[in-house]
């Protein structure tokens, strides 16, 4: 199966491409800018994909340019779907990665796909708008939508929480500045997400939306303590008010029952590594990166 992958060089795109290739599929990374409809049309026509995994988009909630969320996450996706419907033979399946952020703040836990969306930031709003827009194509394309809950792994940008922690603990930094230590999130492994996406390309039901989650949330303070236990390093944590968002989602925990039941019908069970295993992999990668940087003379060390 030839898979057109957007965001192929991103945090999820790289391991997904490797996972799909290992399973015998051909993966072609999209080169065109999603906001350039003409270039996108040409490239999609050249690739003629059997399936599409759309991961490209702005994923950092605190991104400074609010308009960019909509330009890329909504209009860029519109351009992609518009190019796909013009193919003589449309792809068998199109997977669109949305986000659990569309649920917003809710007392419901775990959250099922049927829960009413109520996003509280531009990132979540742009993803929900993308979902609604995509549904206008369901009469012409087989589309599945995923709502991944928080996940992490080696290679994630240090703008995100867990990689930032891994870097600081690997460097045995004396302190770190964080936001609210009492928010609760799932911290799933990127490998699980990649496995789920490939499985949904093959077995997903068109028009359906699936949470990609574990149903196991952790308070941030617990994660900090686990890093300390894994490294034997006690680090002072400073709560920086600038990192505490006014519209913070306090608890985000998904219900995996719908996806698990779908895959079980095909004899598939997702492997969900423990948080300790995931953090261990990230510490190893961060330590390797630290050793590499130390081998370069004149590299400054900065901690924040």
What are these regions (language model features)?
Residues 78-122:
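Conserved Rossmann-fold NAD(P)-dependent oxidoreductase catalytic core, especially the SDR/UDP-sugar
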Residues 3-21:
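N-terminal Rossmann NAD(P)H-binding glycine-rich loop of SDR-like oxidoreductase domains
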Residues 109, 132-185, 190-199, 224-230:
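NAD(P)-dependent short-chain dehydrogenase/reductase
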Residues 165, 169, 174, 203-244, ...:
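Mid/C-terminal beta-alpha module of Rossmann-like enzyme folds, strongest
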Residues 34-72:
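NAD(P)H-binding glycine-rich loop region in Rossmannoid oxidoreductase-like domains
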Residues 122, 126-129:
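Active-site helix of classical SDR
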Residues 190, 209, 222, 242-269, ...:
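Conserved C-terminal active-site "lid" loop/helix of NAD(P)H-dependent oxidoreductases
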Residues 272-304:
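Amphipathic terminal alpha-helices
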């Amino acid at each position: 199966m030839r898979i057109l992958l957007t965001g192929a060089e991103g945090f999820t795109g790289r391991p997904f491409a490797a996972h799909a290739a290992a399973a015998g599929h051909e993966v072609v990374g999209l080169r065109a800018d999603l906001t350039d409809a003409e270039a996108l049309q040409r490239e999609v026509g050249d690739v003629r994909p059997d399936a599409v995994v759309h991961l490209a988009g702005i994923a950092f909630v605190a991104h400074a340019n609010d308009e960019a969320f909509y330009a890329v996450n909504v209009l860029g996706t519109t351009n992609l779907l518009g190019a796909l419907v013009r193919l003589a033979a449309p792809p068998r399946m199109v997977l669109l990665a949305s986000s659990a952020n569309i649920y917003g703040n809710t007392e419901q836990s775990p959250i099922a796909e049927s829960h009413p969306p109520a996003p509280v930031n531009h990132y979540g709003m742009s993803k929900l708008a993308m979902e609604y827009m995509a549904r206008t194509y369901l009469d012409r394309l087989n589309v599945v939508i995923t709502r991944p809950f928080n996940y992490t792994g080696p290679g994630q940008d240090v703008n995100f929480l867990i990689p930032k922690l891994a870097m600081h603990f690997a460097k045995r930094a004396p302190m770190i500045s964080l936001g609210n230590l009492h928010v609760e999130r799932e911290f799933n492994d990127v490998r699980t997400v990649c496995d789920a996406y490939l499985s949904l390309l093959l077995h997903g039901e068109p028009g359906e939306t699936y949470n990609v989650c574990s149903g196991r949330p952790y308070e941030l303070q617990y994660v900090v303590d686990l890093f300390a236990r894994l490294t034997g390093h006690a680090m002072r944590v400073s709560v920086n008010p600038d990192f505490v968002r006014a519209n913070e989602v306090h608890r985000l925990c998904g219900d995996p029952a719908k996806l698990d039941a779908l895959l079980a019908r095909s004899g598939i069970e997702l492997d969900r590594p423990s948080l300790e295993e995931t953090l261990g992999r990230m510490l190893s990668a961060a330590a390797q990166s630290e050793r590499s940087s130390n081998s370069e003379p004149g590299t400054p060390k900065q901690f924040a």
